[in-house]
Swiss-Prot record:
Region Disordered, annotated ranges: 1-24
Alphabetical list of HAMAP family matching this protein: Catal_peroxid
Function as written in the Swiss-Prot or TrEMBL entry: Bifunctional enzyme with both catalase and broad-spectrum peroxidase activity.
Cofactors required: heme b
Protein name: Catalase-peroxidase
Assembly and binders: Homodimer or homotetramer.
Modification(s) after translation: Formation of the three residue Trp-Tyr-Met cross-link is important for the catalase, but not the peroxidase activity of the enzyme.
This protein's GO CC annotations: cytosol
Amino acid sequence: MDAKTNDGKAGQCPFTSGRGHKNRDWWPEQLDVQVLHQKSNLSNPMGRDFDYASAFASLDLNAVIADLKALMTDSQDWWPADFGHYGGLMVRMAWHSAGTYRITDGRGGAGGGQQRFAPLNSWPDNVLLDRARRLLWPIKQKYGRKISWADLYVLAGNAALESMGFKPLGFAGGRVDEWEPQELFWGPEGAWLGDERYSGERELAEPLAAVQMGLIYVNPEGPNGQPDPLAAAKDIRETFLRMAMNDEETVALIAGGHTFGKTHGAGDASLVGPVPDSAPIEDQGLGWKGRFGTGKGADAIGSGLEVTWTQTPTKWDNNFFDTLFGFEWELTKSPAGAHQWRAKDAPAITPDPFDESKKHVPTMLTTDLSLRFDPIYGEISKRFHENPDQFADAFARAWFKLTHRDMGPRDRYLGPLVPKEVMIWQDPIPAVDHELVDDNDIADLKAKILASGCTVAQLVSTAWASASTFRGSDKRGGANGARIRLAPQKDWEVNQPIQLKAVLAKLEEIQAEFNDAQTGGKKVSLADLIVLGGSAAVEKAARDAGIDLKVPFTPGRMDASLDQTDVESFAPLEPRADGFRNYISDRHQFMAPEEALVDRAQLLNLTGPEMTVLVGGLRVLGANAADSRHGVFTTRPGKLTNDFFVNLLTMDTEWQPVAGQDGVYESRDRKTGTLKWTGTRVDLIFGSHSQLRAFAEVYACADSGEKFANDFAAAWAKVMNADRFDLKA
């Protein structure tokens, strides 16, 4: 077959994909359900049974680190090392791998090794990092499946720091590689460096945590390229806050990272080739091929900035602050035309990366000067300048947090280099220190819970509120810890605080009575009782519908204390909308309700069918927030029936918007006009969207009652156990 494609015809037939349009091209506003089916085993070459934790346990980590350190000074002709050392490049690669993390939805971060895929591999802010990854390939090739790319990126950053005289706090493995690009909302813009994400007085849209499309944090030249250090400080503070860093951590990270290496802007930026995913096939995935001089070494062009921050760019010291405070600064431009700063009336004291006989005047970025001239950052910077030990400690802690923030609890950390210290941002939960309840205890506790006076709806709502905070993105939230009884979760509107307090009081009575009656050290945690109560209610609802159902339950959750809870960091877990509970808050919504439902389902690691069956079941069980009747398409609430789907899909009724109630609809009998039900966009999407309707039709069939109940129980248990990493080990 002639595989030529340059005539636009040959090579297309008989392939049906060709260059034709996809469904999303024809209907771009259609709800995207495919995000629920990412990370499929079908794209994983390691196979379903591959156990990365076991493979990592067999790794000689010290040997890998030794190889990484040897790499740092083994300069390659195809991409020569600045100052004879790849340390600065590797620190930047690790930083940018982890630095996509955003606290609003927990997405981004180093886990999964997404930097090797589009769009991250082609972001302007990741220019030339493809070289760092290619330099690592021989080491990855040597150790194979024993270390993931995701772990290797972070470990390379740590090894680089060590090789330049800095001692990191530690390293945890456990980041499992992903095998396809994530489809994430990185911003509304259709062009690199666009900034349509702002409104009002430079208010950055959520959940975004970078100022422009294709940047990790901020524009190093200043807001939209305007070289204003004070304005840049505002951007820095907002973006670093959105990736869970306070002011001290921010200063430590910027100053610590900029202690090493340099930026690249040797010539005209127009002489840089296409990004990796647009590069010609013969370039084999390497992008940004330079046509200025040799295109490498002294002729390299990356960001367009040409800055070396210190006089010792391959050594950990305090020279960044020495330079920052030691000179006055004047605006200039790099050879590529980018705004940067040079020291006024300063001698040429900064080394050249490739010619030892040359020296240069000290240079800084606009965002570096922010650390001096912003009043808050300036005070911290002066303290770090005067107290190098404080700076080193702050950088070590901030670097560890940066590179491990998306890994979740310490239970997931692997390897001998894990720090012993427990940090509050890890959302610690006490280890199990008592005998767990057995099957007989569980049966007795279920009976007591159901006899407590709490309704099915109340028990289901409480368990769902506790467990559904889980985010598969950064592995935070979930039922373990019973943090639903603590601030801020106990006060969230969606959790119905008055009802929640009453239900928790009943469960705490049962817990105290059970624990006080034990003589052998056996106990039950409130976290376990909350989940058990919800599961007992689901089983009762199934029995009342004529179906014998057993919801899987495994004890072992523990109760966290308020001292173990960073209240402020849990605030972003509060849902603006929760379609599973038909809830929309008064806060600004940056997604349509049905999009928010899919988004939350994706964070819960649910599939399309699981999302569908859970919505249908939760509606008939009465789990709506504020006891709303929207979507409760049944005359027998509290029973686990498929009525939601049957009554949604019938053609005996028709739907119309309710005047004056945006997003609310009513269903009336086609013949009599009698009002039957009311529902929201989240409810109606299961009849409107073709794929979701296909799922709904499965559960609406006359023979689907038992399948519906069993599928609901399985999906319910999946959510209840979403944070039980001890069960998945």
